Swiss-Prot record:
Name of this chain's protein: Esterase FrsA
UniProt source species: Citrobacter koseri (strain ATCC BAA-895 / CDC 4225-83 / SGSC4696)
Known role: Catalyzes the hydrolysis of esters.
Coiled-coil residue windows: none
Keyword Aminoacyl-tRNA synthetase applies: no
The entry's keywords: Hydrolase, Serine esterase
């Protein structure tokens, strides 16, 4: 499709699509406590979505660009689902969250197409991909406009990967009983097979959100990174998240001996937030296939089993959980009962001795992941390492933590 036609298709106003905040209809909407965390951002008054500035900046978005897009959304006088929430403009038009972030992404996509230097063009494509991902955030099931933005994010990511250092391969893995899934294998310079980090991302992120992790931390150490979307989103959208949360990653892990670029004898799993649920499950179920497991702000028990803690997290995050579980119309009580089944302690795993070395990093007073969560993980391992990460300065401490975790992973892979 030509650039002009793509623009016309993208930015033609459409009003029949449901607005994101209406997709999950839970019944007990309460008052919203103030929440701020490094990995999830903060719930800012008058916004439905959590504003995750740190992670967006970490992925390469300029803070001024974030403010510019937010300003366009705030200034819109278009009809909203909720007059009190800026990012609930109805229809695909000016002021709508998905429209404005996609419009910003298109500007970078056009720059990428016009740039003759492959390296700079690749950077612009990567920037566009990150912006399209923000447009699709928080990736709720049935959000048609967000799914279109996600498709554009994936396309931009593929374009970026062709131009940036290292090598990227898009790989299909067959999963018994359902559709195959697509993963991205990021390889550093040099000859493989490479020691590999299997990324297990959070429920509100996509596999294309982690290029920075590969480029800054893993690639310099000669490690490859294999990413896979969590069940129910992105390339794994045909799979529903179940209590067997590690199902997709487990099948991919088992298939690695057949991937010539991966040294399947040197694989580590790294989980962010709910991705740690997947990674720690793998530590128990696939111990012979993993050298180690690292977690950051894990969600493996407390948030899944403690109704008081669930009451302190923002509306959007509960909507994400309900969406992933396919419980779009569930009451909070029904959601709590189901979430409890996802606790690895309730499942009888955590608390039992695990032979896999496990590291877990935490922030004090993290509303999503208390210190006890990380202690439970590391004390269950025969070789556990607990890492406390100071909150301020946020960006520097996040970078330092990732460097330390990468060093620990590298040591386990040697």
């Amino acid at each position: 499709m030509s650039q002009a036609n793509l623009s016309e298709t993208l930015f033609k106003p459409r009003f029949k699509h449901p607005e994101t905040s209406t997709l999950v209809r839970r019944f007990n909407h309460g008052t919203q406590p103030s929440v701020q965390s490094t990995l999830d951002g903060k719930n800012v008054p008058h916004w439905y979505r959590m504003i995750n500035r740190l992670m967006w900046i970490w992925r390469g978005i300029d803070p001024r660009e974030i403010l510019d897009v937010q300003a366009r959304i705030v200034m819109s006088e278009a009809e909203r689902t909720d007059k009190e929430l800026y990012d609930t403009v109805i229809g695909y038009r000016g002021g709508n969250w998905i429209f404005e972030w996609s419009k910003q992404a298109m500007e970078w996509q056009q720059k990428a197409c016009q740039e003759t230097d492959p390296q700079r063009s690749g950077r612009h494509w990567l920037h566009a991909s990150s912006l399209y991902n923000i447009a699709a955030y928080p990736h709720l099931k049935g959000d048609e406009l967000a799914e279109q933005a996600q498709a554009l994010a994936n396309r931009a990511y593929e374009e970026a990967a062709q131009r940036l250092p290292g090598s990227l391969r898009e790989m299909a893995f067959s999963i018994p009983g359902g559709a195959p899934v697509t993963a991205f294998l990021h390889m550093p310079k040099g000859d493989g097979p490479f020691p590999t980090v299997l990324m297990c991302g959070g429920l509100d992120s996509m596999q294309t959100d982690y290029y920075t992790l590969f480029e800054r931390y893993f690639a310099p150490r000669g490690m490859a990174m294999l990413t896979l979307d969590m069940p129910s989103v992105g390339f794994s959208s045909k799979w529903k998240l179940t209590q067997d949360s590690s199902l997709l990653h487990q099948h991919v892990l088992k298939a690695l001996p057949g991937v010539p670029w991966v040294d399947h004898t040197r694989v580590v799993a790294f989980g962010f937030r709910f991705g740690a649920n997947v990674a720690v499950r793998l530590a128990y179920l696939e111990a012979p296939r993993l050298k180690a497991v690292a977690c950051l702000g894990p969600v493996v028990h407390a948030l899944l089993s403690d109704s008081q803690r669930q009451g302190t997290v923002p509306e959007m995050y509960l909507d994400v959980l309900a969406s992933r579980l396919g419980m779009h119309d569930a009451s909070d009580e029904a959601l709590r009962v189901e979430l409890n089944r996802y606790s690895l302690k309730v499942q009888g795993l955590l608390g039992r001795r695990c032979p896999t070395p496990m590291l877990s990093g935490f922030w004090k007073n993290d509303p999503f992941s208390p210190e006890e969560e990380s202690r439970l993980i590391t004390s269950s391992s025969s070789d556990g390492k607990l890492m406390e990460i100071p909150f301020n300065p946020v960006y520097r401490n996040f970078d330092t933590a990732l460097k330390e975790i990468t060093g620990w992973i590298n040591h386990r892979l040697c």
